[in-house]
C-alpha cells in the first residue's frame, strides 16, 4: 500500500507521496527565495515599458488561444503604390550601386551613393509629404531597409537610423510649428543629417539610468539649461548637422514655473553649438556606417 496523502482531484482521487510535499516546502521554496536575491530588480525603464500600452495580440497568446485575426484586421501590411514603385525603382538602383567589399575596405560609402540617398529622399521616408518627405508607412520603411541590408548592412543602418530614432519623429510628434517648418524639409532631403544622442558612456541606452544632466539657469535675462553630458556610440554623429541630445533636467531653483518640468528631455543642438564637441569616430564591430 502506497504511503501518501489522499486529496481531491478534478476527476476521481489522487495519491500524493509526502516526499513531494517536503520537496515543495523545502528545496523549491529555498531555490525560489535564493533566485529572488540573485536576480536584479526591474529597472525604472523596464517597469515603464511593462506598464506602457494596452493588451493586444499578446493577450491571446497568454490566454492559450492565439489568433492572427486581430492583427490582420488592425494592420494593413501591404505596400502602397508609391512604396512599391520606390522599391522597384529607387531601391533597386541603389542596391546596384552598393559594393559592400569597397564600403568595408574604405570605411565609407561612395560620394555618389550619399548623393543618391539625399536626392531620392531616403532619409525622409517617415516625414510627411507636405514637408518634402515620402510619407511611407512603418512597413514600407521596413521593407526598404530589409532590401538594402541584403546588399550592405552599413548602408541599411545609414538609411534606417534617421527614419526610426531621433529628431525626425520627435519633431513630428512634439515639435513646434516653427521647428517643423525649419527642420523637417531639410531632414527629408538630407541637407541636414540627424543623430540621436541617447547612449551614455556609463549607462548605455537605459534612459532612466542616464547620468547626463542639465541645470535650469537664467543668464542675461534668458532662461536656459547648462548641460553636462558625455555620449558614446551615436550613429551618424560624425556627419550630423543636428543632434537630438537626451539628458535629465534639474530645476533646483524652481525657475521653470509651469513652462516645463524636471525629468528626461531632448534638446536640438545644431552642429557647432557652443560647448558641443563631436569626438573621434568609434569602430563598433568594424561597421562602416558613421
Can you say where each PLM-predicted feature lies in the sequence?
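A short core secondary-structure module
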Residues: 222-276
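Amphipathic, small/basic residue-rich leader segments at the start of a protein or domain
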Residues: 4-162, 169-193, 205, 220-225
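Short, solvent-exposed loop/turn segments at the edges of secondary structure
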Residues: 162-166, 191, 207-209, 238-242, ...
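Flexible, small-/acidic-enriched active-site or ligand-binding loops
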Residues: 274-290
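Short Pro/Gly-enriched beta-strand edge/turn motifs at strand-loop
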Residues: 192-198, 226-227, 275-278
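Short helix/loop capping segments that flank catalytic or ligand/cofactor-binding pockets
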Residues: 50, 134-136, 182, 205-207, ...
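A gly/ser-rich beta-alpha-beta helix-loop segment of oxidoreductase catalytic cores
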Residues: 195-216
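Short, solvent-exposed loop/turn elements at beta->coil junctions and helix N-caps
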Residues: 199-202, 233, 281-284
Amino acid at each position: 500500500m502506497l504511503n501518501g496523502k489522499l486529496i481531491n482531484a478534478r476527476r476521481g482521487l489522487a495519491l500524493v507521496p509526502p516526499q513531494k510535499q517536503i520537496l515543495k516546502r523545502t528545496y523549491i521554496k529555498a531555490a525560489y527565495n535564493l533566485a529572488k536575491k540573485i536576480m536584479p530588480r526591474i529597472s525604472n525603464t523596464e517597469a515603464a515599458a511593462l506598464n506602457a500600452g494596452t493588451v493586444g495580440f499578446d493577450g491571446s497568446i497568454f490566454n492559450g488561444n492565439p489568433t492572427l485575426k486581430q492583427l490582420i484586421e488592425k494592420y494593413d501590411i501591404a505596400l502602397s503604390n508609391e512604396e512599391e514603385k520606390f522599391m522597384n525603382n529607387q531601391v533597386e538602383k541603389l542596391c546596384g550601386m552598393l559594393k559592400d567589399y569597397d564600403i568595408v575596405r574604405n570605411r565609407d560609402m561612395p560620394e555618389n551613393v550619399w548623393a543618391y540617398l539625399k536626392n531620392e529622399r531616403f532619409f525622409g521616408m517617415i516625414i510627411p509629404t507636405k514637408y518634402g518627405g515620402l510619407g511611407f508607412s512603418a512597413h514600407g520603411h521596413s521593407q526598404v531597409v530589409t532590401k538594402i541590408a541584403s546588399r550592405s548592412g552599413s548602408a541599411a543602418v545609414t538609411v534606417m537610423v534617421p527614419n526610426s530614432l531621433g529628431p525626425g519623429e520627435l519633431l513630428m510628434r512634439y515639435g513646434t510649428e516653427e521647428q517643423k517648418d525649419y527642420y523637417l524639409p531639410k531632414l527629408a532631403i538630407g541637407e541636414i543629417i540627424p543623430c540621436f544622442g541617447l547612449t551614455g558612456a556609463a549607462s548605455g541606452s537605459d534612459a532612466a539610468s542616464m547620468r547626463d544632466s542639465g541645470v535650469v539657469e537664467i543668464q542675461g535675462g534668458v532662461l536656459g539649461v547648462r548641460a553636462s553630458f558625455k555620449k558614446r556610440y551615436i550613429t551618424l554623429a560624425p556627419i550630423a548637422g543636428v543632434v537630438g541630445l537626451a539628458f535629465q533636467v534639474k530645476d533646483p531653483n524652481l525657475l521653470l514655473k509651469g513652462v516645463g518640468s524636471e525629468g528626461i528631455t531632448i534638446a536640438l543642438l545644431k552642429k557647432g553649438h557652443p560647448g558641443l564637441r563631436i569626438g573621434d569616430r568609434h569602430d563598433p564591430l568594424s561597421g562602416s556606417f558613421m
